[in-house]
From Swiss-Prot:
It comes from Streptomyces avermitilis (strain ATCC 31267 / DSM 46492 / JCM 5070 / NBRC 14893 / NCIMB 12804 / NRRL 8165 / MA-4680). Belongs to the cytochrome c oxidase subunit 3 family. GO terms for biological process: aerobic electron transport chain. It is found in: Cell membrane. It catalyses: 4 Fe(II)-[cytochrome c] + O2 + 8 H(+)(in) = 4 Fe(III)-[cytochrome c] + 2 H2O + 4 H(+)(out). It comes from the Bacteria. This is Probable cytochrome c oxidase subunit 3. InterPro entries: Cyt_c/ubiquinol_Oxase_su3, Cyt_c_oxidase-like_su3, Cyt_c_oxidase_su3-like_sf, Cyt_c_oxidase_su3_a-hlx.
Amino acid sequence: MSVVATATTVETGHAHPSVNRPNLTSVGTIIWLSSELMFFAALFAMYFTLRSVTGPEHWKEMASHLNFPFSATNTTILVLSSLTCQLGVFAAERGDVKKLRMWFIVTFIMGAIFIGGQVFEYTELVKKDGLSLSSDPYGSVFYLTTGFHGLHVTGGLIAFLLVLGRTYAARRFTHEQATAAIVVSYYWHFVDVVWIGLFATIYMIK
């Protein structure tokens, strides 16, 4: 993941030059994401605890029901959406609202595809393999970890719509709108990194 700046180059309309310092909104978002990281750390701990209790052989048997190629493709889409999101941030820092809209719309579509793929995977697991939230400890932890992440991705999609809506509603692109785009990118990169960890843990570790 590329590191994003916390200050923008968009004109603010003040006569005096702006100081290149961290934006308080961005700093607050980073602190909040740190608390979210602890939440997902607890989910990871639950996963490995249940795995050790039920035994690795049972875990391996249940994991065989997962569609690895499909999930790997879905993961690739989410990872690439982080790149398009960052391109949108670069556009926001230049004050290029048209490019910001373009890249954020592309990111939104890719994120929506990821969520659609996750719903499809859930449907297949329930219908074909009978793996549900209450059928098995593995099913419980699988749906809880991936489901909570899916809710976070959905929250990110809503945030993209809000940022895009503000750019269309406002008469001019402002520093505050650029900051909002940067803050949303922090969140999106976060859910991307968390998913990479979940994917490696659930789909790759035997």
